[in-house]
């Protein structure tokens, strides 16, 4: 919502509801901390990758990066997710790159495709972990989202934040974009800011595009070969994708933003770009592959994550925590 990042009067009109939201969430958190409500401890270490605010912060590229880095260290990694946008009739569901996005959710299918890691979705994270461990050998589990899902105990927490929008107006829902108060950042292990650094950054992520891939033929083409086109995006922050393409020198004749996790129909997109290249995100592409046209291209990005400050050693410290954590579980 635009007013989340402004001084709109709507903020004060909605602030009583935000107070109620905060009280309920605080009570719920306290009940888990005191053991009044039960929580689940997985038999393997769990890393949460989540957000403090709603909207597109860049969580999925961080999950992909984390899984790939853990695998480089010789660890067998499994991924669980709520599977937002999934319409599966049964849960938990084992997701592969061939799972229909309407069943598996666009982000879990993308993660499975990019990492080749076992992925299981379910609103019940315990059931997701139990199915995951029954069908795959895992040394460590990455939870895609779930920072506020206190029913699942965790060993490390990573928060991903948009560097520019940060925490918005600082209010919790619905007056602001936050799911919890900014003070929650004091208890997480690592903060990655997307697109630059701010006062909260432990590390900074830049999303790096290398080429465009044709949805129908899988042809790869350098982005500099394109002069113009049309772009669509059904992600949390569509403008970030459009701006990226323009910075690469592509003149966008038209842009069309859709809601996050949009379910696309061929007719929606065909009329947008009949004779021009149509660019979309990789997340959108997994939902459009089955009815793709010759002029449709997606632009995959890789997460490049660096220290927030040159003299810092936040990343080595973070990996040291993970090494220690895995060793503790292996030694019982």
From Swiss-Prot:
Its EC number is 2.7.1.130. GO terms for molecular function: ATP binding; tetraacyldisaccharide 4'-kinase activity. GO terms for cellular component: plasma membrane. ATP binds at residues 53-60. Disulfide bonds: none annotated. It comes from the Bacteria. Transfers the gamma-phosphate of ATP to the 4'-position of a tetraacyldisaccharide 1-phosphate intermediate (termed DS-1-P) to form tetraacyldisaccharide 1,4'-bis-phosphate (lipid IVA). Belongs to the LpxK family. This is Tetraacyldisaccharide 4'-kinase. It comes from Haemophilus influenzae (strain PittEE).
